[in-house]
C-alpha cells in the first residue's frame, strides 16, 4: 500500500438542503468517483466548523472509489440554528439519524455506508452507534471527543448552567494554531466566515456526558471500527480514545495513535498525514472486502 498523502486538488461539491426537526440542514455531496462506487462515506464534522473543510479527506476517498457526503450540524456552517447552539437534548443524534436514513434510502442494495466522524463529530457518531440510533456498516473515528479534558471547575459549571441557562453561549477558547502543523489550514480556518468559536451550555453538557457513556459501551462494540487519534492533541484529551481502545474488542476495533500529530489528523502536513491516509485506505480495503463476502 503506497503511503501517498491526500491529493492536493480539491474535488467539486454541491449543496442541497433537507428539513430535520423543523430546521434546515445543509448536505454536501462531492463529485462521484469514476466507475461504479464501492460504497458511500458519510462525514460528520467537528465543533465550530463545517463539512466544507473536509476536501482533503474527500479527495482520496473519491480516488479510491467511494462516494462522499457530509452535512453541516445544527448551529454550524450553512445549517440553521444559533452558532454553537443545541435546541434539544437529542438534536445532534436526531439529525444524524435523519441524514443517515436519507442516505441509506438513496443507495443501491448491498452498497456499504461508512460513517466517519471527527472530534465532536466522532463523539456524535460513536454515541449514535452506542445508542443504536444509527447502524452503519463501518465506522471511522478521528480524534473523537470521548474525553473533553475538563477540569473540576468546568465540570461544576457544566453540571449547573444547563439547568439554569441552557442556551447561554460562550467562547470555546480554541487555540487554532494547534489544529494542525499545516499553517495554511490554520489560517484558512481562522478566516473562514462559516467557522465559529461558540458553545452553548446544553451542548457542553452533552460533550461532557456522552463521551464517558460511549466509552462504557466499548466492551460490547459490534460495528467494525477504525479509531485513530492524535497524541499531541490540545482540543480533546487523547485519554478518551485510549480508554475506548483498551475496552473494545480488538477483533472489531482497530486502534492507532499518531503521537506527533495535532488534532486534525486528516488536515495535517502532507508528510504527517501520509500514514493516516495509508492506515485508512488499508482498513477500508479489508473492511469492504469482508462485507462483500457471502454469509
Region annotations inferred by a language model:
Residues 48-51, 77-107, 274:
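Catalytic nucleophile-loop/oxyanion-hole region of alpha/beta-hydrolase
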Residues 223, 237-246:
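Short alpha-helix in the alpha/beta-hydrolase fold that links the catalytic acid
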Residues 58-82:
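Conserved alpha/beta-hydrolase
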Residues 118-200:
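Alpha/beta-hydrolase-fold enzymes
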Residues 221, 227-229, 233:
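Short beta-strand/loop motif that positions the catalytic acidic residue
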Residues 2-32:
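N-terminal cap/lid segment of alpha/beta-hydrolase-fold proteins
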Residues 254-295:
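Catalytic active-site module of serine/aspartate enzymes centered on a nucleophile-bearing elbow/loop
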Residues 107-118:
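Alpha/beta-hydrolase fold nucleophile elbow
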Amino acid at each position: 500500500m503506497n503511503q501517498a498523502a491526500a491529493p492536493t486538488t480539491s474535488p467539486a461539491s454541491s449543496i442541497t438542503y433537507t428539513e430535520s426537526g423543523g430546521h434546515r440542514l445543509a448536505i454536501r455531496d462531492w463529485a462521484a468517483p469514476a466507475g461504479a462506487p464501492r460504497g458511500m462515506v458519510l462525514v460528520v464534522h467537528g465543533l465550530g466548523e463545517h463539512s466544507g473543510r473536509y476536501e482533503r479527506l474527500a479527495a482520496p476517498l473519491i480516488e479510491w472509489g467511494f462516494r462522499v457526503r457530509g452535512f453541516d450540524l445544527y448551529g454550524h456552517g450553512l445549517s440553521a440554528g444559533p452558532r454553537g447552539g443545541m435546541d434539544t437534548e437529542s438534536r445532534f443524534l436526531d439529525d444524524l439519524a435523519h441524514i443517515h436514513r436519507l442516505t441509506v434510502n438513496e443507495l443501491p442494495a448491498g452498497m456499504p455506508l461508512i460513517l466517519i466522524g471527527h472530534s465532536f463529530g466522532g463523539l456524535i457518531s460513536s454515541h449514535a452507534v452506542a445508542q443504536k440510533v444509527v447502524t452503519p456498516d463501518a465506522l471511522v473515528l478521528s480524534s473523537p471527543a470521548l474525553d473533553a479534558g475538563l477540569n473540576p471547575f468546568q465540570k461544576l459549571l457544566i453540571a449547573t448552567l444547563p439547568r439554569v441557562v441552557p442556551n447561554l453561549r460562550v467562547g470555546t477558547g480554541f487555540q487554532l494554531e494547534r489544529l494542525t502543523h499545516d499553517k495554511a489550514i490554520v489560517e484558512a480556518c481562522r478566516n473562514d466566515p462559516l467557522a465559529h468559536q461558540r458553545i452553548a451550555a446544553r451542548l457542553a453538557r452533552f460533550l461532557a456526558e456522552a463521551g464517558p457513556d460511549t466509552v462504557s459501551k466499548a466492551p460490547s462494540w459490534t460495528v467494525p471500527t477504525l479509531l485513530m487519534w492524535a497524541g499531541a492533541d490540545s482540543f480533546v484529551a487523547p485519554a478518551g480514545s485510549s480508554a475506548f481502545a483498551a475496552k473494545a474488542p480488538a477483533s472489531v476495533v482497530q486502534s492507532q495513535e499518531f503521537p506527533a500529530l495535532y488534532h486534525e489528523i486528516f488536515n495535517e502536513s502532507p508528510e504527517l498525514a501520509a500514514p493516516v491516509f495509508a492506515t485508512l485506505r488499508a482498513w477500508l480495503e479489508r473492511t469492504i472486502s469482508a462485507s462483500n463476502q457471502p454469509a
